[in-house]
């Protein structure tokens, strides 16, 4: 293969139906406004089913009762999931109280779901409540524009409460990047906010009239923490600081985890290093990467349309050279950086600004009032007295940030009263994560969020049995191969295959810089636990000092590392 130009810059052939849908949508309007008034169905029909995703929503239904409703000759119980745009995950207590009330009053489930893309989702919004939801967000100074479909999604930023000045600078860049890459269409304001329709023609100078070939994800990362999982993202700006001040970014392009079962033309891929840029070129480089992918990405096959496949097709150097040409900027050599972990620092930490920051562990990011643990109410009670801000993390947790010394005891008392602080939560539970999956996700093949808590309890038992109760394995479960749970960057990753069955992947690492290989296909939870027990037993006896589980299974020859995922991800290279 010739790296310089291994494949065509543009894939010719019949465009996918998604491209037709976008081109006929009148800049994302479709007939959504008319569909809103159709009371004969609880859902959106035709192209609108997909177009609403550009407006931050997915049409879902309760899969637990789908068969029952079909027997009764009823349509599925349609409801929307709405995802807020929240670059860097920062939200004020006043905004939080607004979304807390809406979730209680206007959703079927009454919960707020913190996601691993640093925002929140409402699940179960009936069609009649969709417009009020967007209007509420607008009143709070928020929106849901471009949190789904073929656009640049919510921009992540490392949740680093300690280095407060550096975090603030990085966060400001996350916001700027998000705003710069937003769709320019007035469709969102017209449909949801009753903005006046103007006669001017819409233009999309960056995204183009048919937007991007596929979803596009961006992060701003502050080493040594890789909490945002940069290798799951298309475009990454890794902060480079000098004396605590941000001076530029290392740029990495082309990460992504989504695959399709049985299709070896799909694979996860780590992001490639392009080089270093000073701060002043950040937006130019972001735009150039996006427009290159816009023009070169595969619009004939959505399964092969993401940036990672474009890089493999045209070659990293060819793509990089085009970005430099479009931006009028040359990359310098990558500056040194390293990652030491991805987990959140649960509990109190003191920042360099002398303020305190409390990271609350929220299992699977689901804030709801449970018997004896009124989590959602607890966060609302804290919001009523907190003078700083809240930060949603890429690990689905919540940081109460900027707490002065005088308020610390009162906030901790509220957190403990409502079950938001629990000294008995293990390191293993804190380092486990799942996507939503059943009952609301239409793509779910196996349980994830509802499956994980009890599964972790059994893994905790295995660790304790082998004398490793204080240890942890980065464990992730994703309900389908689209990979929202980021299982393909875990030490142990479970990818849903069918109800009660998963593909088991081993050999990622704690830092999130290695993709795990499939060890067993289509097996049950009991089979996974049996394998885990055997391997943890070996890890306990044979590991080196501070050696993580993922590093151990590679060194011990249990499984071979994925070196070049485009070529070796599907190789069966099991050693013992």
Curated annotation (Swiss-Prot):
It catalyses: hydrogen sulfide + 3 NADP(+) + 3 H2O = sulfite + 3 NADPH + 4 H(+). Alpha(8)-beta(8). The alpha component is a flavoprotein, the beta component is a hemoprotein. It comes from Yersinia pestis (strain Pestoides F). Its EC number is 1.8.1.2. Its cofactor is siroheme; [4Fe-4S] cluster. The lineage of its organism: Bacteria, Pseudomonadati, Pseudomonadota, Gammaproteobacteria, Enterobacterales. This is Sulfite reductase [NADPH] hemoprotein beta-component. Binds 1 siroheme per subunit. One of its GO terms (cellular component) is sulfite reductase complex (NADPH).
């Amino acid at each position: 293969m010739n790296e310089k130009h291994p494949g065509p810059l543009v894939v010719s052939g019949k465009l996918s139906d998604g491209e037709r849908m976008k081109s006929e949508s009148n800049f994302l309007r479709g007939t959504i406004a008319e569909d809103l008034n159709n009371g004969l169905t609880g859902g959106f029909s035709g192209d609108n089913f997909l177009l609403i995703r550009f407006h931050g929503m997915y049409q879902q239904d309760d899969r637990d009762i789908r068969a029952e409703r079909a027997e009764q000759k009823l349509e599925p119980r349609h409801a929307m999931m709405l995802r807020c745009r929240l670059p860097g995950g920062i939200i004020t207590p006043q905004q939080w109280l607004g979304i807390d009330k809406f979730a209680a009053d206007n959703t079927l489930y009454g919960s707020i779901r913190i996601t691993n893309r640093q925002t929140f989702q409402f699940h179960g919004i009936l069609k009649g409540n969709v417009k009020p939801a967007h209007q509420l967000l607008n009143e709070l100074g928020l929106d849901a524009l471009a949190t789904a479909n073929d656009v640049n999604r919510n921009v992540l930023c490392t949740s680093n409460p300690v280095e407060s000045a550096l975090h603030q600078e990085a966060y400001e860049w996350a916001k700027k990047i998000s705003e710069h890459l937003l769709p320019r269409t007035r469709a969102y304001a017209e449909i949801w906010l009753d903005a006046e329709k103007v006669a001017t023609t819409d233009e999309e100078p960056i995204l183009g009239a048919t937007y991007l070939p596929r979803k596009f994800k961006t992060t701003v990362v502050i080493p040594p923490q890789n909490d945002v999982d940069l290798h799951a993202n298309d475009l990454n700006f890794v902060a480079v600081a000098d004396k605590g001040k941000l001076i530029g970014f290392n740029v990495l392009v082309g990460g992504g985890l989504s695959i399709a079962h049985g299709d070896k033309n799909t694979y996860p891929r780590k992001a490639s290093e392009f080089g270093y840029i000073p701060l002043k070129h950040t937006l130019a480089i972001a735009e150039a990467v996006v427009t290159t992918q816009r023009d070169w990405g595969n619009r004939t096959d959505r399964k092969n349309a993401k940036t990672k496949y474009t890089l493999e097709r045209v070659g990293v150097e060819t793509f990089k050279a085009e970005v430099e040409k479009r931006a009028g900027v040359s990359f310098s050599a990558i500056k040194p950086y390293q990652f030491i972990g991805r987990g959140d620092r649960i509990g109190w930490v003191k920042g360099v600004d002398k303020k305190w920051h409390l990271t609350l562990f929220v299992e699977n990011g689901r804030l709801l009032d449970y018997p004896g643990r009124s989590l959602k109410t607890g966060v609302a009670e804290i919001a009523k007295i907190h003078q700083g801000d809240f930060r949603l993390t890429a690990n689905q947790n919540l940081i109460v940030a900027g707490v002065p010394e005088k308020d610390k005891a009162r906030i901790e008392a509220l957190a403990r009263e409502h079950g938001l602080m629990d000294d008995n939560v293990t390191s293993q539970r804190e380092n486990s994560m799942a996507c939503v999956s059943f009952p609301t996700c239409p793509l779910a093949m196996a349980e994830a969020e509802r499956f994980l808590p009890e599964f972790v309890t059994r893994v905790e038992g295995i660790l304790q049995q082998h004398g490793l109760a204080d240890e942890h394995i980065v464990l992730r479960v994703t309900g389908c191969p689209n990979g929202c749970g980021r299982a393909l960057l875990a030490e142990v990753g479970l990818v849903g295959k069918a109800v009660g069955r998963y593909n088991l992947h081993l050999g990622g690492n704690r830092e999130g810089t290695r993709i795990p290989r499939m060890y067993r296909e289509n097996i049950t939870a009991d089979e996974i636990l049996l394998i885990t027990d055997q391997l943890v037993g070996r890890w306990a006896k044979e590991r080196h000092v501070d050696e993580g589980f993922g590093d151990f299974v590679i060194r011990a020859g249990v499984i071979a590392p994925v070196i070049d995922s485009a070529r070796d991800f599907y190789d069966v290279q099991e050693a013992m």
